[in-house]
Regions:
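Phosphate-binding/catalytic loop of phosphoryl-transfer enzymes
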Residues: 1-50, 55, 62
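ATP-binding/phosphotransfer module of carbohydrate and carboxylate kinases, centering on a glycine-rich
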Residues: 2-4, 43-172
């Protein structure tokens, strides 16, 4: 196995809601008020007056699919939308792929904010994580974006290396 050990970790859950657990120096962060890791209530990148969870949840996948496809989503589950993206079920494949990509982008924005405080490995799980092939591109794009100063100087939005460990070509 790999001898590298990590003492700091951000564990992300994508599913009914958007959650996180934070480990710093091998200790679970609970916070003084039991609020350690409350990523769900971070500012939403797209809808800045809403919480992040409105764009990073099962309901977000359904809402975005409905908006993009123009189809009724009352009886669709995220698994159904995943199956549409895969071509297993009929529906608007492009809207299905984009609904997961947008979830990834919005989750990525919140994860970037969290990583400014917690310099550690990110592990992602949860019920919606099964759609990783559609979520991770938007997430990685967001985490690799640049940000600038008024003078026009650009910086990577994260100062640490960002790689997807599911893609062997991305890490050494």
């Amino acid at each position: 196995g790999n001898p590298k050990r990590y003492k700091n970790l951000l564990g992300i859950t994508l599913g009914t809601g958007f959650g996180a657990g934070v480990v710093i120096d091998n200790c679970l962060l609970t916070g003084d008020n039991g609020c350690g890791g409350d990523v769900w209530i971070m500012r939403n990148k797209k809808y800045t007056d809403l919480i992040a969870e409105e764009s990073v949840s099962i309901r977000a996948v359904r809402r975005v699919y409905g908006e993009l496809s123009g189809e009724a989503v009352d009886n669709l589950t995220p698994k159904d939308i995943y199956d549409i993206a895969e071509g297993i079920l009929t529906g608007n494949r492009e809207a299905a792929v984009r609904s997961f990509d947008e979830l990834g982008e919005m989750a990525g924005a919140a994860i970037v904010s969290a990583l400014h405080i917690v310099d550690g490995m990110v592990v992602i799980g949860g019920g919606v994580a099964g759609a990783a092939k559609y979520i991770l591109p938007g997430m990685m794009r967001e985490m690799r974006r640049s940000i600038s100063t008024f003078s026009g100087r650009d910086f990577d939005c994260l100062q640490m290396e960002v790689c997807n460990l599911m893609e062997p070509d991305e890490y050494k």
